[in-house]
Regions:
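Predominantly flavin-linked oxidoreductase catalytic cores and closely associated redox partners
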Residues: 2-128, 143-150
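Short secondary-structure junctions
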Residues: 128-135
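Oxyanion-binding "anion nests"
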Residues: 136-157
Length: 157
């Protein structure tokens, strides 16, 4: 892993140069996730939401998980406060990641995610005996700001 402060990014006909404090980095294409001054200045003019989630990797004694069936954006669990969905990423017949995700302005308390995860596992996966072997959570900021307008052929914002 490289740790450096990026001072600027410039491109020419053949390459992109990422100018760092320690050294320069070169590539054919660069993904630049730094917010620009225009975005910061106009932040309040755009819709902003958070995608926030809690996921559990569960292990079951019985082989009840369909390892060939990925469940994406299942909206059957309803939370009237905002848009939410659950997804299932199976690893084995007895092991899967189940994650409950929201799109909203504010995050939830941990017990809200847990309630809906337990409900989904029992009601839709029909699993009552399981062990949580790993947990993950996160918050991803989202906006309607048109970053693509700040992109070029070799730099994606």
């Amino acid at each position: 892993m490289i740790k450096d402060n990026i001072l600027k990014i410039r491109e020419d006909n053949e390459k992109v140069v990422v100018v760092g404090n320690r050294k320069n980095y070169y590539g054919k294409h660069v993904f630049d996730s730094r917010p620009n001054k225009k975005f910061i200045r106009e932040f309040n003019n755009y819709t902003t939401l958070k995608q926030h989630f809690l996921g559990w990797i569960i292990k079951t004694k019985e082989k009840k998980i369909n390892k060939k069936s990925f469940v994406f954006m299942d909206y059957r669990i309803k939370d009237k406060s905002s848009t939410a969905f659950t997804y299932v990423l199976p690893f084995k017949k007895n092991k899967a990641l189940i994650e409950h995700t929201y799109f909203s302005k504010n995050e939830c308390e941990k017990n809200v995610y847990e309630k809906y995860l337990m409900e989904y596992i029992e009601k839709f996966l029909k699993i009552s005996d399981y062990e949580i072997i790993e947990s993950e959570s996160g918050v991803i900021p989202m906006t309607s700001y048109p970053f693509y307008k700040d992109s070029s052929k070799k730099i994606t914002k």
